[in-house]
Amino acid sequence: RNDMKVKSNFAKYIFIIFIIGIIILVAYKLNEEKKNTTDEEQTNVVKEDDIGKEIKLGIAEFDTMNPLLSKNKQVQEITKIIYEPLFQLTSDYKLEKCLAKDWAKTAENKYLIKIDTSIKWSDGNNLSVDDVIFTIENLSKIDSIYLENIRHITEINRVDDNTIRLILDQEVPFFEYNLIFPILSKKNYEGQDFIYGSSNNAPIGTGKYKITQNSSDSIILEKNENYKRAELTLEKITISKYSNVGEMYNSFKLGKIDLITTNNIGIENYIGTIGYNKAETNGREFDFLAINTQNQVLANKEVRQAISRAINRESIISQVYGGKYRTQDYFLDYGNWLQGDKADTSYNTDTAIQILEDNGWEYKYNRWQQYINYSTKIINFKLVVQASNETRVAIADIIKSNLEEAGIKVTLVKATDNQYQSYLDNRNYDMILTGVTLSLSPNLETFFGDGNLANEELNSIMNEVKNITKEDLLKEKYTRIRQIYNDEVPYIGLFSNYYEVASNWTLKGSIPANWYNIFINIDNWYKN
């Protein structure tokens, strides 16, 4: 019994020692984790202190820092962070107030705009209605990329110290989207010629950064201490001037500048394919097929639907553009908040054939035909293309081949420049391959106005949206417009270009933006 008691006590001691050991081990682990957490926090503090607050950019073929006069792409991009408009656009192209505090459409052609006069210029003076009037009046007298924005303004009246009235020569749907041009200081140009004055070397602005130096080879921007509407990480931006784009690309390749933007589909031939971060944003150049919906055959929406599904857009992009374009079906499919839900327009010859068969078309005698209104209708139409545009001719050839695979007969009309313009202006075509530079405005009257599509509901909605300011209602109406578009297929969207944003791997933050403002997220950029 004594032996058993000793053994029992011994086992208890071993168990107690084991438990104590576990407690010590757990305590040690907890202490190590706490130590590691402290070390990480200290490391993070060091990293925060080591964040680079200066970046380097480039401008090729510099002209002027006056944003109303400049025709330079890089200047127009960079001046978005120096000067501000009455209204600006968000990342999804929604209009928001900037220098304007409030606005109202008081009649078809009249607008009241209240200015936020608490905003300061970088020299410390307050923004005034006189600055806005000064800008618009000078803009109307010069050759500017923004001239079209104010073309319909016939009068600008000062209502009071913070309000102006704009009167247009006609109703312009969504005119407020035109008021996105930069506003300049009247005082800054007092006694000077607007085009040749010395202030154009470094015009003051209300934006996030200000020009502190503009020499023959570089421009330096620093934080605008009077800008109070955001916390900025970057404190200095050095902009080098280059004689040509190739020189600027080479400088980026060597790491001398941190970011470039381009829609050059051959950019990789200049900067290579590795050693930098790449982001893409939708471009503005949109190619599509315009359709004469009054044509006896093309008036049938199932024919238009079938044509759309029979076109291999991806193959065209690969063959013609080397994969450097994107498929696009609709005029707002560049990321616009009003674009609505996309339809399936992917290439499928079988689907195209099925659509025709389901709607009474019969493939007979090597052609699609249907007996309609006492006569046999045959799907056989002409596709007009501009002969001098070799790229579009190549596209048209592929489209013709695609459609013929589905049994759809097409005759290409390769028109001279004058003939092509006449076809386009007079709508004297069955179908025409064309394209547009897309607007920042969601106004679709260019495409759906003038009876281009006989749809009473669509016409009614188009009249309604001109005067809707409530976002949820506007979105509801545009959702319905897209549904009608998807069903009716009054146009056949093909593809659009895109911008490539190449950045140094040490540049951090949310770099992708949109083609309105690549610096829209600059608040959180930094170097690491």
Segments from the language model and where they lie:
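N-terminal lobe/hinge region of extracytoplasmic solute-binding protein
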Residues: G58-A107, E137, I204
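Detector for C-terminal structural segments
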Residues: A310-G340, T391-K400, L424-N528
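A structural "hinge/loop" feature
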Residues: I59-T79, L99-A100, N125, F175-L184, ...
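Surface-exposed binding/hinge segments that line
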Residues: A104, E148-E190
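Ligand/substrate-recognition segments at binding pockets and active sites
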Residues: E362-G435
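Ligand-site clamp/hinge motif
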Residues: N226-N269, K409-T411
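Gly/Pro-rich hinge or "lid" segments in bacterial periplasmic/extracellular proteins
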Residues: K73, K94, L179-L232, K236, ...
